[in-house]
């Protein structure tokens, strides 16, 4: 073992040990969630499994965490996959959806503004934490972005988890309970039947890597905020719109991304006293109520104005996860491209504008800290337990 230490730095061995333990717990929990039909099972399962496991088994806590050097390549890949959802066939139909698209964008801006003002002025949140908690959509991407911008990324995770739970409870009820569960099951089947990396041509794998790395380098050169996310998103979008690339979602990477993001946040949550989380839970529920009420009103208005089915418009508007909501649309016979396009535009709108907006807003104790020198993604977690918001 001593010889191994002379070859591999101690910090790297520690990071690898944490990764192995975290991924073992995350994978087991995710597989369990998959078996009982939970939506986004590997994301939800890894988050809850690592969180609860670390909270109940205190000696496990020092061995949980996902290092930043592992986390950033995952974000690169996520950026490429977000950009890949924009292709020419979707763009060809965008013109006839202009009214619903504008309504959705305006609703998103209004909802985010209301949520931000509530959390900032009445609950005392720091500006960046408030804006990250207020954005309606893109759970995995929001959590990944929060880790780069604030210390208390577990608060952002809690807000988005509450919203997703509300959506997955309310939407199947609106679309009939049995069919809703069928859609969740199909969503999980779709994850399992995505193409494997072993089935991809070598050129697709090379393209995937190049879009991520080159996109990040271009964004760094242009001094764009969060270059490892925004760069791959921008370059991937351009290449897919121009027809230069056509990348599928790869089963192994999608699962890996869910495990890495969910496991990282779960490890942070495990070290935060439960009493502190309760202080944020009330705010998360209030924020979710505002989001869903606003989108519900927008859905009613647009359905009456255009004659579009209420349920089709609701699926296009409700921020409950692009892939899961798209599969709900497929099960119930709605226009899948219509639903997917609106969700994709909202996610793109949020994550192309949010880094610049968050930097402009600035922040206090949850503002940016120079973590670039951190070799372990778990070292900053000691400062994550700030005081809960006001009252």
Where are these regions (language model features)?
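Juxtamembrane and boundary regions of transmembrane helices in multi-pass small-molecule transporters
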Residues: 116-125, 167-188, 222, 300-305, ...
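Long hydrophobic alpha-helical segments that form multi-pass transmembrane helix bundles
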Residues: 164-209, 216
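Cytoplasmic-side transmembrane-helix entry/capping segments in multi-pass membrane proteins
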Residues: 45, 65-78, 98-100, 124-135, ...
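Alpha-helical membrane segments and immediately flanking helix-loop junctions
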Residues: 122-162, 310-343
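Helix-loop-helix hairpins and the membrane-proximal interhelical loops
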Residues: 68-69, 73-111, 120-122, 193, ...
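Small-residue-rich segments of transmembrane alpha-helices in multi-pass membrane proteins
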Residues: 72-84, 107-108, 131-143, 164-170, ...
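Membrane-embedded alpha-helical segments of transport systems
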Residues: 136-142, 156-179, 294, 322-324, ...
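Structural signature of multi-pass alpha-helical membrane transport proteins
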Residues: 2-70, 80-90, 111, 197-273, ...
